[in-house]
Amino acid sequence: MKRAVVVFSGGQDSTTCLVQALQQYDEVHCVTFDYGQRHRAEIDVARELALKLGARAHKVLDVTLLNELAVSSLTRDSIPVPDYEPEADGIPNTFVPGRNILFLTLAAIYAYQVKAEAVITGVCETDFSGYPDCRDEFVKALNHAVSLGMAKDIRFETPLMWIDKAETWALADYYGKLDLVRNETLTCYNGIKGDGCGHCAACNLRANGLNHYLADKPTVMAAMKQKTGLK
């Protein structure tokens, strides 16, 4: 039996990954992390979606220690969330240092216990948001370290790594879940479901991608299929 664990926030990217994983694996588990994030409403959204979409199990892990250690606008209400995209070589104040190191490591431990062969994460380098822990180089390096440390080949999969946000919308549409992803996920840094606040960097990236996809569906869908190998 093929099993996978999805690092699941209830946002656009991880929900799209979950939708795809449910088509590709016999058993899919979700892991969500509570680190005292500003947009904590995502945890309830993740619970609802994991149940609705049919995940085998959904585990919410308390990692509030991360909140104490990592200072970010996502962990401190006193730091405002930016409503712009960072410079290409800058790291935005929404970056939570060590977050993906911790999340992927804990997800791999869970995968080890449930005998899953893969950990799936929705990180993406194409729409680079200034997060060093979303890079392909980082994921591969951590994957190697985790596999060595556990003496087990647990594969880190990044299905969105080389597609942009418009193509991520196309992927959701390919599986017939565009409306669900648009209306029932939470990507907004300010914790507003669906189209969000419309002002933060996460909402801007999401909206721009959706508008691009809706304006030229055939072209974007074709590009997504070419990059992902889907027919």
Swiss-Prot record:
Question: Which cofactors are named for this entry?
Answer: Zn(2+)
One example of the protein's molecular function in GO is: zinc ion binding
Q: Which InterPro entries match?
A: QueC, Rossmann-like_a/b/a_fold
Catalytic reaction annotation: 7-carboxy-7-deazaguanine + NH4(+) + ATP = 7-cyano-7-deazaguanine + ADP + phosphate + H2O + H(+)
Q: Does the keyword ATP-binding apply?
A: yes
What's the superkingdom here?
Bacteria
Q: Provide the family line.
A: Belongs to the QueC family.
Q: What is this protein called?
A: 7-cyano-7-deazaguanine synthase
Q: Which gene encodes it?
A: queC
